[in-house]
Curated annotation (Swiss-Prot):
The gene coding this protein: mshA
Chemical reaction(s) catalysed: 1D-myo-inositol 3-phosphate + UDP-N-acetyl-alpha-D-glucosamine = 1D-myo-inositol 2-acetamido-2-deoxy-alpha-D-glucopyranoside 3-phosphate + UDP + H(+)
Organism phylogeny: Bacteria, Bacillati, Actinomycetota, Actinomycetes, Micrococcales
Function statement: Catalyzes the transfer of a N-acetyl-glucosamine moiety to 1D-myo-inositol 3-phosphate to produce 1D-myo-inositol 2-acetamido-2-deoxy-glucopyranoside 3-phosphate in the mycothiol biosynthesis pathway.
Assembly and interaction partners: Homodimer.
Designated name of the protein: D-inositol 3-phosphate glycosyltransferase
Binding residues for 1D-myo-inositol 3-phosphate: H13, D24, A25, G26, G27, M28, N29, K82, Y115, T139, R159
Length: 420
């Protein structure tokens, strides 16, 4: 078996150093940073490459022992829409190659790219360096386009074409769940034998069920309040509009419930999506509190302060928030879609809802409100189940994928030309 000493992780469209829940930062950012840290703990040197988005960013950051982040200069040193990144691929690849040449080691054993833009760059670098590419999609254009709401902009054709090229050219593909692996096969014709399934983990030192009473008190949640919590980017795909409608319906049905809804996150994507207006139109201003994203320790405290964490997503490759909330001992109500259907044990650690009808979601909330003993049991079961989901497990599976990629690498890769 080949020895993996050094890995280049590509996350060109968003930095793992960014705050999850803002801009394009979300579960993928957490995934990359935690995976890198766990790989480093396993003895692998990890170098992450991301595009610099501020003139004040240092060229190199060292977030954890054995992990460094290169802020690659390509295009303007500011945040730009993801749609403009393909035009910078050539300059990003050139800059990464220059960084590699300046390194004393001068070589990586594996390239691991995340998201399609990084995958296209990864194909070029794989050919240039003569090392295998391992790729994790995180989201897929064809899957997202199947779930579009009326009036929403579809993912561009060039992304679909790019993802097909990545599937054909990568030595290994890593999926978060078996359902994501099935989507790679059905939508992109991937060879199932080249797919490894590495479920995301959770930071079990941060996301713990301790001090729930203190968390509620610290966040001003009264003992009798039924507290619903949403944490994530504010975009239609994540479904906060479904949650607001369902909470409003629950309030109409059950005026006896002292209801509170906290939304942690910032607007991402379509700037016309106005959550505050939706809240006002539903006459829920006195119930809903919208706050910016918070650090992981504070997020864990918010999870502990909630009775239920809600994820009404239209698509999720995994749904890291669901796992983190359960690790804090809080049941999760989520859409039965993608990785959420596996992250949550329906009836044991939370509830899965089919579709996005507000009445169905209100039914789920009402059922849990009326049965506090079940909520407690679900929370306990959720915390116990999460104990088997540390990042070391994810890193071990990922390392196996790297080994398989290196062992099977024969130097023949699909010619990599940036998609235009």
């Amino acid at each position: 078996m080949a020895l993996i000493r050094r890995v280049a992780l590509l996350s060109l469209h968003t930095s793992p150093m960014e705050q999850p829940g803002s801009g394009d930062a979300g579960g993928m950012n957490v995934y990359i940073r935690e995976l890198a840290s766990a790989l480093a703990e396993a003895g692998v040197e990890v170098e992450i490459f991301t595009r610099a988005t501020s003139a004040s960013q240092p060229a190199v950051e060292h977030p954890d022992p054995g992990v460094c982040v290169h802020n690659v200069l390509a295009g303007p040193t500011k945040k730009i829409p993801k749609e403009e990144l393909p035009g910078l691929l050539h300059s990003m690849v050139e800059e990464i190659e220059q960084i590699r040449r300046r390194q004393p080691h001068g070589r990586y054993d594996v390239i691991h790219s995340h998201y399609w833009v990084s995958g296209i760059a990864g194909l070029e670098l794989s050919e240039l360096w003569g090392v295998p590419l391992v790729h994790t999609m995180h989201t897929m254009a064809k899957v997202k386009n199947l779930l579009l709401e009326s009036g929403e902009q579809p993912e561009p054709r060039r992304r679909e074409v790019g993802e097909h090229r990545i599937v054909d050219g990568a030595a290994r593909l890593i999926a978060n769940t078996s359902s994501e692996a099935a989507e790679l096969v059905s939508h992109y014709g991937a060879d199932y034998d080249r797919i490894d399934i590495a479920p995301p983990g959770v930071d079990l030192a941060t996301f713990t069920p301790a001090f729930r009473t203190k968390a509620r008190r610290d966040h001003g949640v009264d003992p009798g309040t039924f507290h619903l919590l949403f944490a994530g980017r504010i975009q239609r795909l994540k479904g906060p509009q479904v949650l607001v409608k369902a909470a409003a319906l629950l309030r109409q049905r059950r005026p006896d419930i002292d209801l509170r809804l906290t939304i942690l996150g910032e607007l991402s994507g379509n700037k016309e999506f106005n959550l505050r207006k939706l809240v006002a139109d539903a006459e829920m201003d006195d119930v809903v509190t919208q706050l910016p994203p918070v650090t992981a320790p504070e997020l864990a405290a918010w999870f502990r302060a909630a009775d239920v964490v809600v994820m009404p997503s239209f698509s999720e490759s995994f749904g890291l928030v669901a796992l983190e909330a359960q690790a804090c001992g809080t049941p999760v109500v989520a859409t039965r879609v993608g990785g959420l259907s596996r992250a949550i044990f329906h009836g044991r650690t939370g509830l899965l809802v089919d579709g996005h009808h507000a009445a169905d979601w209100a039914d789920a909330f009402e059922a849990l409100y009326d049965d506090p003993a079940t909520r407690v049991d679900m929370g306990r079961a959720a915390a116990i189940r999460a104990q088997n989901s540390g990042w070391s497990r994810t890193a071990a599976i990922t390392l196996e994928s790297y080994h398989a990629a290196v062992d099977r690498h024969v130097g023949h890769l699909v010619p990599a030309v940036p998609v235009t």
